[in-house]
């Protein structure tokens, strides 16, 4: 059965190694070379000091068809695409690897003693399936900086913001780990200081023992000198006094040296206590920093959850916005359709109104003219009746005088009367027809043409007098004329009925216009209510975003305070370390001074011993026994001195070794401090970058909220553009800015169109109001004209017919008053 293949290729920044072809029949161990397992081209063992023996495992899962890598508690870690799989000395979960990934085993380590840097293993891995096909590349998968572990779900992968927060927490945890290592090293330093203190105590004890031996030798020498000399009492007294003075001087010098040593010891103890206090303070501060770090991590997690919740809320609000905009567009479309229908109806009603108004004016003019003609006919009939009565009376009188049969005459008179009446009626009908034709001509002509019917009427009146005489002679023609007059009266009644019908239609049109107005107002009220609700929703969302921004600002302030506190604590610990180093140097100097003083004392003692030996050689002949004792004492003293010197040399060498160890550890601490400083600088820069990104995201969210408030009256095209803007916001902020500018321009265009439509609506409303005002003015003028007509009728009934030209002139003036505004309105 063929097996999967993994090829490890060396990269330029890696520790050099040959290309490895490893077949993954079973899980393959990756580690450092040992005696039993040497590096070869078919295994994953590398000759690198940075790797652990059991560093990691790599294998191929035949069920899922995927390659996995696991860190097995390595000290320096395993990295996939610069992402560490687990913490130090912890086993990681299996993580999927893809072909083309960059895998790093360990990190670069620098030795302090030799200043040698040991490189790590950095390789590009190529994976081949058992069928010989290359595994999928990282570029073919969803862009994610971290490989997904086996026990994680792809849906729960964090966003870029939460991943950066996780990286920050990882950096903080590594810094805490380094601080713990520093604490351990400080504890070892404290132990070394205690050991040096004990060694100094033992050295002081040895010095005191040496002083005691020297004092005893001095006493023995004095005794030998006193015994060997056979001197007088005065000389003995003088020697004793001199010896006592020397003894006193030696004692004073020894006491002063002891006092100095004790003072230095007290100072050293005091400094050690101060160092211990500073260590305890630093430990307390470290614990406090750990607690603060845990709190900040919890707050960062809460912030990430809140941020995700805010993003979801923004999505929900955007969905609601889309739904509301869709409803608003539907309402706008309905409103526009109704508006168009109402506008069309209004235009039709205005046209009908104009037509009806023209009909009313024409009928009113016809009615006025017919009324005038009827009044003139009535006057003529009265005159004719008076004439006929006079003639009848004259005929009756003549007949009564003649005494003949009057019945035939009466019948003839009645026939004559009927014929006259019928003739007048036919004349009236013909005159009404002529008046209608003249009215149509008068509407097209000027005021001079409107005055022409009055002249014609005056000429007709003169002709009517002549026709009256002819009517008496032609009764049959007059009867037909009277019939025509009756028909004209009936047509006048029909015209009145038509006027009433037109008035009813006008009232109905006004009612329709009022109902359309009410509908428009209702639609406007609904639109305003929806706008208010939408504005309230937008205000609530802006308030929530402002609250989240305030919380983010508070967290920024807290992180800045923590960073400042951490920097101050680091500086204080650095100052304390510097002071401890200075104190150690002072202690070294004091030890050197003590050693030099001790050497001077030993030299002085050796000189005194030489003097004593010379004196002993002088007195050797006198006291051989004392010489033997002195030689034995000298031998023992030399042995002890040699032993003391050997012990001191051993202690000096041991102290020098410890000093070298301390210096090495001090150098290591300094390098670690420098690395910590660098890491702190990196962390501060990353925090600043994170803060800048958070600030940019806040600005972008503010811009999005402002854009959402601007895009309230946008349409479906703007919704698609807003969706594209949101997707591009997740990908690239620069593209988002450009798209936002486009969306703003489009929103401004839409807003301008909306303003234009509003202006058009306002103009239409103004026109509608103007038409209503004109209607009201026309109705008022009609009422005034009716009142004037009634007054004129009353005056015509009361006054004789010769005033008819004046009435015609008044009617012409009213017609001009009615028609001139209509012409002025029609001209624009």
UniProtKB/Swiss-Prot annotation:
SUPFAM superfamilies: SMAD/FHA domain
Gene Ontology CC: centrosome; cytoplasm; endoplasmic reticulum membrane; FAR/SIN/STRIPAK complex; M band; mitochondrial membrane; plasma membrane; sarcolemma
Annotated InterPro entries: Cent_Immune-Sig_Mod (IPR051176), FHA_dom (IPR000253), SMAD_FHA_dom_sf (IPR008984)
Stretches the record annotates as Disordered: 433-467
GO biological processes: muscle contraction; negative regulation of hippo signaling; protein localization to plasma membrane; regulation of membrane depolarization during cardiac muscle cell action potential; regulation of sodium ion transmembrane transport
Transmembrane domains' residue ranges: 803-823
Residue segments, region Necessary for targeting to centrosomes: 1-163
Domain called FHA: residue spans: 28-85
Residue ranges, Extracellular side: 824-828
Annotated function: Associates with the striatin-interacting phosphatase and kinase (STRIPAK) core complex, forming the extended (SIKE1:SLMAP)STRIPAK complex. The (SIKE1:SLMAP)STRIPAK complex dephosphorylates STK3 leading to the inhibition of Hippo signaling and the control of cell growth. May play a role during myoblast fusion.
Annotated protein name in UniProt: Sarcolemmal membrane-associated protein
Gene it is expressed from: SLMAP
